[in-house]
Swiss-Prot record:
<keyword id="KW-0959">Myotoxin</keyword>
<feature type="site" description="Important residue of the cationic membrane-docking site (MDoS)">
    <location>
        <position position="121"/>
    </location>
</feature>
<feature type="site" description="Cationic membrane-docking site (MDoS)">
    <location>
        <position position="128"/>
    </location>
</feature>
<comment type="similarity">
    <text>Belongs to the phospholipase A2 family. Group II subfamily. K49 sub-subfamily.</text>
</comment>
<comment type="function">
    <text>Snake venom phospholipase A2 homolog that lacks enzymatic activity. Is myotoxic and displays edema-inducing activities. A model of myotoxic mechanism has been proposed: an apo Lys49-PLA2 is activated by the entrance of a hydrophobic molecule (e.g. fatty acid) at the hydrophobic channel of the protein leading to a reorientation of a monomer.</text>
</comment>
<keyword id="KW-0964">Secreted</keyword>
<comment type="subunit">
    <text>Homodimer; non-covalently linked.</text>
</comment>
<feature type="region of interest" description="Important for membrane-damaging activities in eukaryotes and bacteria; heparin-binding">
    <location>
        <begin position="121"/>
        <end position="133"/>
    </location>
</feature>
<dbReference type="InterPro" id="IPR033112">
    <property type="entry name" value="PLipase_A2_Asp_AS"/>
</dbReference>
<dbReference type="GO" id="GO:0005576">
    <property type="term" value="C:extracellular region"/>
</dbReference>
<dbReference type="GO" id="GO:0005509">
    <property type="term" value="F:calcium ion binding"/>
</dbReference>
<keyword id="KW-0800">Toxin</keyword>
<dbReference type="GO" id="GO:0016042">
    <property type="term" value="P:lipid catabolic process"/>
</dbReference>
<dbReference type="Pfam" id="PF00068">
    <property type="entry name" value="Phospholip_A2_1"/>
</dbReference>
<feature type="signal peptide">
    <location>
        <begin position="1"/>
        <end position="16"/>
    </location>
</feature>
<dbReference type="GO" id="GO:0090729">
    <property type="term" value="F:toxin activity"/>
</dbReference>
<feature type="disulfide bond">
    <location>
        <begin position="65"/>
        <end position="137"/>
    </location>
</feature>
Amino acid sequence: MRTLWIVTVLLVGVEGSLVELGKMILQETGKNPLTSYGVYGCNCGVGGRHKPKDGTDRCCYVHKCCYKKMTDCDPKKDRYSYSWKDKTIVCDENNPCLKELCECDKAVAICLRENLDTYNKKYKIYPKFFCKKAEPC
């Protein structure tokens, strides 16, 4: 469990319900969140939003934009719960803010699965200083 915590911290900084996000990514992609996405491209992991290198990196960019658009909750502190039913992520929250946070994390996990064919090992540990600023969300 401690490894999963470290994995998710590296994946998205200290934002969101980190343990849940890591589980979602593992469930959807079958990949270890830390070793596969921890410092992937220009947007996965800690740091600002940059021009995505590929579809996988774009998923992380869109995820950061999703967090940025939240107004009624704090993705850095708030925690949610979800369930995995019939290989589908179900956000179980009644609280609208926590449900929105869960849906942002669900969307990135599904996006990463849908973009497994764009995953490029050359971006697996990509130096952020090669990244260019992206358009605003």
